[in-house]
Amino acid sequence: MSMQSTHPPKPEAPRLPPGIPESPSCQRRHTLPASEFRCLTPEDAVSAFEIEREAFISVLGVCPLDLDEIRHFLTLCPELSLGWFEEGCLVAFIIGSLWDKERLMQESLTLHRSGGHIAHLHVLAVHRAFRQQGRGPILLWRYLHHLGSQPAVRRAALMCEDALVPFYERFSFHAVGPCAITVGSLTFTELHCSLRDHPFLRRNSGC
């Protein structure tokens, strides 16, 4: 698949893992076409940055991606993003890029390696008005399902603060150790998730 596609594939709707309930809005998605999941485009960059800035600045003091970096990734690899829209407005999103090394490093924050097989999840953010509704887990599960439909992507990787490790472990991520990336005085744990062994693939195959 060309990583330069300007018409990224529309993600399929997966089933959620046990213990992660669908929110009321997700349960009604078949009767509410205004609730939509799709890959982002460069035109969504400003909305994404506004959500990201509000979510991260107050907690970490920095954003995972600045506006130019968001535009950069949504131009190069829009198929590695996923947004949740309500009434046409972006309310939650994930942005990723491809990486070609076993572990993340400082360069992976800004680079997209088109020949790589690891999807690096740069940011997951939910608009403040839609938090505490289970949207983060739903979006992440759909995103992993979307990645699993892309043959070139074999694994997902991310870095997070220690307090968030249990959240990602619910989705079959496992910690591989301290991340080589630091942001100021902040340190992170690196987590990986094999998409070839992920539970949704076993269910979809009938196993």
UniProtKB/Swiss-Prot annotation:
Pathway: Aromatic compound metabolism; melatonin biosynthesis; melatonin from serotonin: step 1/2. Substrate binds at L124, M159. The modification Phosphothreonine is found at T31. Keywords: Acyltransferase, Biological rhythms, Cytoplasm, Melatonin biosynthesis, Phosphoprotein, Transferase. It comes from the Eukaryota. It holds the Pfam family Acetyltransf_1. It catalyses: a 2-arylethylamine + acetyl-CoA = an N-acetyl-2-arylethylamine + CoA + H(+). One of its GO terms (biological process) is melatonin biosynthetic process. It is found in: Cytoplasm. The record marks H120, H122 as: Important for the catalytic mechanism. Its main location: cytoplasm. Disulfide bonds: none annotated. cAMP-dependent phosphorylation on both N-terminal Thr-31 and C-terminal Ser-205 regulates AANAT activity by promoting interaction with 14-3-3 proteins. Residues 35-202 form the N-acetyltransferase domain. Its EC number is 2.3.1.87. It is an enzyme of class 2 (transferase). The keyword Acyltransferase applies. Residues 1-28 are annotated as: Disordered. The modification Phosphoserine is found at S205. Controls the night/day rhythm of melatonin production in the pineal gland. Catalyzes the N-acetylation of serotonin into N-acetylserotonin, the penultimate step in the synthesis of melatonin. PANTHER family: SEROTONIN N-ACETYLTRANSFERASE. Belongs to the acetyltransferase family. AANAT subfamily. This is Serotonin N-acetyltransferase.
